[in-house]
Amino acid sequence: MENMGAFQFRGVQLDLARQMETLDFIYEFIDFIGKSGYNTLVLYLEGRIKTKSFPYPVAGEYYTPEEMKAVVSYASKKNIDVIPVVSVLGHAELFLKHKEMKHLAEIRGDAKSTLEETINHVFCPSLPETFDFIKNYLSEIAAIFPSKYFHVGCDEVWDFGCCSICRDRIHNGESHGDIFAKYITDMHGFIKNELGKDMIVWDDLFECYPNALAKIPNDVILCCWNYDRRVDLPKAHFKSRLEEDLLAKYEKLGFKYIFAPSTFLVANIESFTTYSSKYSPLGGLLTVWEKSLNFMYEVMPLVHYAGRLWSGKDINFNDAIKDVFGCGDNIFFDALRSNYEIKATHPTRLSPLSYLAGPITEFEAIIKSSSETNSDIFSLFLERCINDNARNMLEDILVSLEWKKIMFKLRTVVEELYSFDEKCPDIARRKYITSEMAEMIDRYLKKKLDQWKRFRKGISSAGIEKTFTEFRNKVLELAETSAKAAGVLKVKFFLPDMYNAQKCKFTIVFEDGSTEIAAEGIFKNYEMNDAYFIYKFPYYTTRQPVSVRIESWLYGGLGIAYLEIISRKSCFYPVSICNVKGNVQSIQHILVNDLRFCYLGETDMNALLQMPELTKRKHGLTLVLGERQEE
C-alpha cells in the first residue's frame, strides 16, 4: 500500500459490553497498541460501569469507576487517550434489562417491536425521564474519562418511533428523522455545553433519515463504519445498499469524521484506508466486536497492521506481521491473510440444522482446503514465535481453525442424517456419528475453557460453557429426531443484501387438510459470498403433502428461486400457484428450477424506515405440489 502519512486520530476499539476482559489484559492491550502506533483506545461500554445513578448491575457484570480510572491512568502514561462509548439510544440492552429501567424503553405498553426483537434495546427519545437518566449517567462517566471526546453510539436503532408518545409526535407532523435529529441535537448540547466535550456518533442512522444530517450541529463527529470487503465507494447498510460518496458529503456539510473498518478482513482495512485517504478524516478507528465466544488474541495481528498503516510507519502487511511474531515467510503471511478472509466469510453456526444446506459448495470446499493447509502452516510456526503474546495469538487462531473442522464435519454428518435414499443410516449409525460429533465438540470446548482460565481469569465462563454444551446436546438429539423425519423441504433462496432482515414462514399442507410449519425465521447465507443458497427443513407428518404456503414480512424482501419436498418415497415439486397476497414479484419463476427467482416483500427500504408499520404487512403465495416418484 502507498504510504499516506500518519493520521491524527489512530484508534482501536475494545468491546467490553459484550464480553468483559480482565484489567490485566486491558493493560496488556494498551501496551500492544502503543507499540503498534495507536494514540487512542475506544472502550465500547454501553452500561458496563456501575455508578450511583446506575446501581443495578450485579457482581461479575460491571467495572467500578475506580477500575476505569486506573485504566485511564495507565493509558495516559503510554500516551494513549481513552474514549468511552455509552449507547444513549439503541444498543441499550445492558441498561434496559434491569426492571428498574424498563420504563425508559421504547417498547413499553402497547408498543410493538419493528423487527420483532425479543429484548428491549432502545431508549425512548421522547421521554424526559430518558434524558434525565442519561445526563446523570454520562456526567458520572465523563468524570472518569478526561478525554476531549465522548462517543454516544446511536447505531442500529431498529425500534424507533414505536411508543405512543413517539407515534403522537409523528401523527402531529414530525418525521422519524425529525425526532432523531432533535435527540442528537439535545444530546450534543448537553455534552458540549455541560460536559465540555466533542460528541462522536455512528453514522448509519443518517442513511435511514438523510434529512436529519442537515438539522444537527456540524461539530458532531461522525464515525463512518463500513465492513465490506472492498470500500471503493461506501454503500449504505440499511437502504438498499445505496452507493454514495459519504466522506465527500460530510466534508461538504462541514462535518469532521472518522472512518471505521473492522478486524473482519484485511482487504476492508486496506481499501477503506485508501478511499478515506482521498479526503481529510480525523483518522481511523479499528472496530473489534463481540468476543464472548472468542478471544482478542486472534485479531491482534490485524490490530497491529492497521496501527502501523495509519501511523505511516509500515505499509506492508508481511512486515507488520513479522514484527508481531518475530518469524514468518511468504507462505506464513499468505496463510494468515487468507485465514482472516475465511473467518469473515464463514462465521460460526450454533444451530445444528443450519448445517442442513445441501451438498458442500465449491466455495466451502475452497475454505475447507485452505483451513486445513493454514492449520498445518501455523502449527509449524507455533514454537518459533518471538514471545508468549505472539504464541497466544497463533494458538488462538489454531483453536478457531479446529472449530472450522467441526463445522465441515457437521455439514456432511447432518446431510447424512437427513438423507432419504439408500444411504439413509439406521439408528445405530445415527447414534455413532452424533456421539462422534459430540466428542469433537467436547474436546474443542475443553481447549476454549483452558484458554479462558489463562486469558480471562476471574471472569465467569458460564456463557461459553452454556452455548457449546447446549449445541453439543442438540447434536446428540439429532440421532433420534432425524430418524423420525418424514422428509425435508428444500428451498433455494436468493438474498441480494446480507443486511436484509426479512422473515419467512413455510407451512406444509397435507392431503387430510392438516398443516405443519416446516420453518420460520430470517434466513441468510452463512458463506456470505453468494446471493443464492440452500436450506433444508425437516418435517415430521407422514401424510402426503399437497401444497406449501409461503409468508414473508419484516425488512428488505427475500427471493425464492425454487423449492421441493423430498420424502422417504417420493419427491414433490411445485406445479401451480394460488392465493397470492402482498408484494410478490416475478411469481412464475418459482415454478422452474433455475437461477431466476420470485421476490417477496417491500424493496423500498426508505419507505420501510419511514413507515415501520409496513414491516408487518404479509406477502405470500401458495404452491400446489405434484408428485414425482423416485426411480
What would you call each of these model-derived segments?
Residues M1-E194, I200:
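Feature activates predominantly on carbohydrate-active enzymes
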Residues G513-E520, S570-P574:
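Surface-exposed loop/edge segments in extracytoplasmic proteins
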Residues M1-E46, Y62-Y63, K148, N387-F493, ...:
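Mature N-terminal, pre-catalytic/accessory segment of carbohydrate-active enzymes
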Residues D31, A70-S73, P128-S139, A143, ...:
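Substrate-binding groove of N-acetylhexosamine-processing glycoside hydrolases
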Residues E516-Y540, G582-S586, L591:
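Extracellular carbohydrate recognition and processing domains
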Residues F493-D497, R549-G556:
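Short beta-strand-plus-loop segments that form exposed binding edges in beta-rich domains
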Residues Q502-G513, A561-I566:
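Short, surface-exposed beta-strand/strand-loop-strand elements in extracellular ectodomains
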Residues A485-V491, Y540-E551:
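Noncatalytic modules at the cell exterior or secretory-pathway interfaces
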